């Protein structure tokens, strides 16, 4: 018997925006940015660490716009899926020709309705974005950062002028991926009051959580789950933080008050990545271990070296 595995890279990024893992209010906000006439322009930052769904997110959000009534263009290192009605420009650093910043500037000068940039490789690209006609053009800018706040800081620093950067900002979407528990073998358990307290979950409202299994009972004997091959997980979903940047937030950006901006994002009432992940754990979609994995503080290289020296 011969088995063959066929992998189509395009399928990996071919998802609708309402199937990314966005919570309902998050999807509604992004959809409003794409469809409401009064919110035509501005920069929306799309943030995710490497290999955490940034391309899938950008493709899905682009497809919320009507490609037949809008001039939509993208600048990418590689086209991972052909998007109907969208002009996808491939920029290759190994080829002779204009650099990324120049390609960005010339694209923005053609008055497109929507432009998506796969990366922010240099400060000149950021400055070209900030100096373009952002009242008429929507720019989706992909950044390799691990939080909504960090993506705003990265963009503002690259522009070099907080007032100019803040003026054009519309919103930010941050994403991290968690693994989805296998529905065939996940194991329910009752969390302790102490555990719920540490997670910030209300006692009495969360009856059970789930953890990975990997095995199922067949005739009262444990066997490896045939669905997930014993891994305990099957697939991935996104946990998002979606925030609108209004007058208050823009003023805080101009002042460089990052703690104030963090507080303003919390007060806005939209779920953060951590809150989104916890909701998915309560819903039985993922495990607390996955929530901890994506929300635990990342150790910097300098701190790692320091700890090794001390050890």
Which ranges hold each PLM region?
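Short, flexible helix-loop junctions that flank or precede catalytic/ligand sites
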Residues: 1-311
């Amino acid at each position: 018997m011969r088995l063959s595995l066929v992998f189509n890279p395009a399928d990996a990024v071919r998802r609708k925006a309402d199937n990314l893992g966005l919570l309902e209010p998050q999807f509604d906000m992004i959809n409003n940015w794409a469809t409401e006439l009064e919110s035509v322009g501005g920069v929306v930052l799309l943030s995710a660490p490497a290999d955490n769904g940034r391309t899938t997110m950008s493709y899905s959000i682009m497809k919320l716009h009507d490609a037949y009534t809008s001039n939509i263009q993208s600048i990418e290192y590689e086209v991972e899926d052909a998007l109907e009605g969208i002009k996808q420009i491939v920029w290759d650093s190994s080829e002779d020709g204009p650099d990324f910043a120049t390609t960005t500037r010339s694209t923005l000068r053609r008055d497109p309705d929507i432009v998506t940039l796969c990366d922010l490789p240099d400060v000149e690209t950021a400055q070209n974005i900030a100096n373009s006609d952002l009242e008429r053009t929507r720019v989706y800018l992909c950044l390799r950062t691990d939080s909504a706040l960090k993506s705003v800081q990265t963009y503002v620093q690259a522009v070099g002028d907080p007032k100019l950067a803040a003026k054009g900002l519309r919103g930010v979407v941050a994403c991290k991926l968690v693994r989805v528990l296998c529905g065939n073998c996940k194991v329910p358990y009752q969390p302790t009051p102490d555990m719920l307290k540490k997670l910030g979950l209300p006692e009495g409202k969360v009856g059970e959580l789930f953890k990975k299994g990997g095995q199922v009972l067949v005739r009262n004997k444990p066997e490896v789950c045939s669905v997930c091959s014993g891994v305990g997980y099957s697939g991935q979903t996104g946990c998002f933080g979606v925030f609108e940047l209004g007058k208050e937030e823009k003023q805080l950006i101009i002042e460089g008050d990052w703690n104030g901006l963090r507080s303003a994002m919390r007060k806005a009432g939209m779920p953060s990545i951590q809150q989104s992940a916890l909701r998915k754990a309560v819903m039985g979609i993922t495990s607390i271990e996955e929530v901890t994995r994506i929300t635990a503080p990342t150790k910097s290289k300098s701190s790692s070296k320091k700890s090794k020296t001390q050890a």
